[in-house]
Amino acid sequence: HVGTTDNLMSCEEWDNECGKVYKGMIDAGVESVMIGHIRLPEYQRKLKPGIKDNEIMPATIAPELLQGLLREQLGFNGLIITDATHMVGLTSQIRREDMIPTTIAAGCDMILYYRDKDEDTQALKTGLEKGILTMERLDEAVTRVLAFKAMLKLHTKKANGTLIPPAEGLSVIGCDEH
């Protein structure tokens, strides 16, 4: 990617195409959604009347899309994960130190990839201090991550030694068939 992508569908087109797919998956019980660094200008204008063109951000940092469209309109209650945060579609829009707390504040629960764990942790702390992110929203995100891990039974798999598949299971990763 060399920049942020715009999905130029009208709201009606999006509802009848992408929206039906999302709603069908949500109704079928999908537990997580990965958010792309794509803008959806027509929907963003509908959900946030008066939004200026330069305020239309990629979905990853757009609360009107994450909370308004995905959670409220489509009824998704699972884990929202960012796409890779080092991609230009996002980094061209916001500095990393602001991106980290802004993604969580906007409605993402988990950030995919970190450049430097300590740096990103500090960015979250600074975001809390600056008011970019509230402790309530951070707690909500952490709760969703922990619930997702519990749903996958990661805690019991780690305890009984089955978290990492046996060697024969791992051997299929990267094999010619895959």
Predicted regions and their residues:
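Generic low-polarity alpha-helical segments
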Residues: 70, 74-75, 132, 146, ...
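A short C-terminal boundary segment appended to hydrolase-like catalytic domains
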Residues: 152-177
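Mid-to-C-terminal alpha-helical segments outside catalytic/metal-binding sites
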Residues: 129-157
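Second-shell residues forming the walls of enzyme active-site clefts
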Residues: 1-126, 132-137
